[in-house]
Amino acid sequence: MMGLYTNKRILVVGAGKSGRAAAAFLIKRGAKVVLTDKKMSLPVDEELKKLAEEGVELVLGGYPLVKDWELLVVSPGVPLTEEPIAYSLKEGIPVLGEIELAYKELKAPIIAVTGTNGKTTTTSWIGEVLKIAGFKTLIAGNIGYPLIEAVEEEWDAVSLEVSSFQLETIKSFKPKVAVLLNLTPDHLDRHKTLEGYLEAKARIFINQDRTDVTVLNYDDPRIRSLGRKTPGRVFYFSQKEELEEGVFVKKGKIVVRSLGVEEEIIDIENLPLPGPHNLENALATVAACWSFGVSGKNIERGLRNFQGVAHRLEKVAEINGVLYVNDSKGTNPDSTIKALNSYERPIVLIAGGRNKGNSFGELAREIREKVRFTILVGECREELKEALEMVGYDKYVVAESFEDAVKKAKELARPGDVVLLSPAAASWDMFKNYEERGELFKRLVLNMVEG
């Protein structure tokens, strides 16, 4: 039987997790697949070897010279200005992301989550609630598990994290519930302006209709304004306002008000994760799951049950009265500010990496108020140093390497302190991704225990 992709010449750009998953999916369906990545070179790892054995042609260290593809599939980390993508867009060759490719095959309803910060925690929290409510749930997307890997299986629901990069290449993607958490400057190296970034995020609801729901953060003016643009039904959440319709905080409890009826869900004291940003994530989770049809009782059980996610304010160990916390997923200044506001204890901060086009001014002011000592590391350490000096903060040292940064943090920390890895920058100057950075931090800390 001829399928949609049989004998079709398809170029997959980017040989990371989602690119590999897309190539594997397409080769199984009889496509002629070329997987290309200009940043990779030979020799290849076992997974790529296996793909090559299955018939995927690998072009690494550059792009194919013969431009004969009929469809291009782009990985989320690859800019649309890259040569083969720009060529395809100019020539009218279809360009899809891995999420769009998977969506065409998936039958399960999707709750999709986007925003600058809190995506991974909220996506995972929603997944936890749905599982407790009895739905066979897949948690996927920009969270380490490509959606395309899940299309062979039957699911009742999908909780999906989507980035602005992934939303750039959707065509028909239509989530049952779309969640927009917040918007602060990030990825301006790619989107150029905050408006361009907002526009990319707002693509999450472009294919919705009145049978779908758009969950928006009422406290973020830019996100709130999207309520006038979405074709879906709007359901707001707020930490600050008592809403006529939506999810909010009243007398220390999370409350849902819908169709004139009010229901208390949980006392905020009983939420398992610290910090005001996690209250925001919890409110978004309640709004999304309520919109999906989950009962208040099951939402409460799911909220309580959640253990948090790796690399996001993850407690690693307490050694000699010092708490070590891995927040490697804090890859922009706003995320690190939220991490700093999660603790009452004095903080020794490890920060630095590759800047994604952000200003460190506001973070520097927050560090001045909250941080006892800062260790600067990575490519943007000089930028951070300048920002700290501009606000009159001089309690910092510069580390020679990541290992040196952790060693210095240990030496500077006192009993009662938190040593917080929250870099406010990407990991690509020293690591493959933020996970690798976080894993090394955890290993170095746990070696202290054994040492």
From Swiss-Prot:
One of its GO terms (molecular function) is ATP binding. It holds the Pfam family Mur_ligase_M. One of its GO terms (biological process) is regulation of cell shape. Pathway: Cell wall biogenesis; peptidoglycan biosynthesis. Its EC number is 6.3.2.9. Its main location: cytoplasm. GO terms for cellular component: cytoplasm. It comes from the Bacteria. InterPro entries: Mur-like_cat_sf, Mur_ligase_C, Mur_ligase_C_dom_sf, Mur_ligase_cen, MurD. Disulfide bonds: none annotated. It is found in: Cytoplasm. It catalyses: UDP-N-acetyl-alpha-D-muramoyl-L-alanine + D-glutamate + ATP = UDP-N-acetyl-alpha-D-muramoyl-L-alanyl-D-glutamate + ADP + phosphate + H(+). Keywords: ATP-binding, Cell cycle, Cell division, Cell shape, Cell wall biogenesis/degradation, Cytoplasm, Ligase, Nucleotide-binding, Peptidoglycan synthesis. HAMAP family: MurD. Belongs to the MurCDEF family. Cell wall formation. Catalyzes the addition of glutamate to the nucleotide precursor UDP-N-acetylmuramoyl-L-alanine (UMA). This is UDP-N-acetylmuramoylalanine--D-glutamate ligase. The gene is murD.
